[in-house]
């Protein structure tokens, strides 16, 4: 049954940090299928950005993918788990569970329960160990520890620690890179992931926009992009320990500069950036065979996304290199570039921890600026593309406790640690932490359909801050860099007046519910029609930015476009539409023909956003209030 399968999958991820015994990995005893894995030592920090780690992970998930049936997959995975690096094993096993047909409907347990040490600072984990060791042997009562602050106000960036260190955001980033591994080889799997390069651009662009909104909410200036490969970088201390080895994710002192590694020189990265920018301005990229591939409006962003990341779909890996991934690796090794001190890398090396570091956002704004440079070569959308004839949006209301105001507060949350680390025999070991949460709300959009027939519309909802850090109104073309997508959905409009109502919990960017390890072991919420994309998505408690105490003003932007022109064949039957805007849809095309981020993905030549509007758009000013 599905439940039995789910239990077997859960057991693969239980107590992973102590699954391998260092020095016990005599590979000769293992199945011949596993001969290409076991290079990365158990206890080392696995990096989803380092080419060597990624290649070994690819070998392993291809072995899992090739397993004859579900039973064979579980058995070979159980064997690999005994000697393969635990982070690499989790990555490969998750990719396999997410993509094997006989695993449809199964969930991977939440990464924050598999590796709580990547999410919960070491002081709290240490406290849990201590509490477990000083109690009588027969005592099984639950243990609760509190997560302590990891910094203080001497560091201006500390004001955003609540956001960067949010468990849900970091788990989303880990999961997104499993659904879209950079080593995914469409020729080998016989499945192309639709618009994967463009999704890489869009998902990270939205992360940057959301981070800037959060900075403005805290009275800080929007971030400055990383810009110059020779500049000293700001420091960061993660306070995380890697339980599998007992070593910590290295902090980065203030003022270090990027330095050459054995694998890559900084001058090579400068050259990669130059070559990509040259190609953008020439309007084409050079393929491996020397032919030119035009960066047209339809595929340009997708081609660039594969180049910049870079993934297996890069048109010319030798020439354009691997800019984004090497940036993560060099920043993570900045404190010990040649390995002379045997230091562990910093958090930038790992997708489940890199969002904690402020430098992540500076780096990604730098990457986003490359795409921005390309988007600026495209013509602004003209009236005919933006307009939806006969459709007029007359008003928009955001319904909450107070109309057009969203209230935020801090909420207490507990994370179960016992499946990842369990010293002793406690029934449960939980870490208590606080995260932001906003009240649920809904949108009511009043639309007039002036035609005589029913129309199908795509409703696109965005939010953007009204004022910049100095209190000036943000101009339209600048605004599009901080516009965040809140929702996108299909609706039917009858002739005459229509009111379209949509709840915030149904958003196309957020994850509505993630079952815990315990839920999965007990078979809660299992359904054969669910797909892997159901566990990818932005955390719903951070759908909107936090605002401030007096109520920060935002533009709520609503646009209706013609669904008959937007629809993609076959996208009606997508089993999981949870976070389709950021995560796409399994084995289907991305269910929207328009470019991701439309209409804010191209230059806007009007000064005020109000001059940009056509009849099918509407802007309502709303407030977001934060209560201590």
Curated annotation (Swiss-Prot):
Glycans are attached at residue 449. Its main location: secreted. Cu cation 2 binds at residues 324, 328, 364. Keywords: Copper, Disulfide bond, Glycoprotein, Metal-binding, Oxygen transport, Secreted, Transport. GO terms for biological process: oxygen transport. The lineage of its organism: Eukaryota, Metazoa, Ecdysozoa, Arthropoda, Chelicerata. This is Hemocyanin II. Hemocyanins are copper-containing oxygen carriers occurring freely dissolved in the hemolymph of many mollusks and arthropods. Belongs to the tyrosinase family. Hemocyanin subfamily.
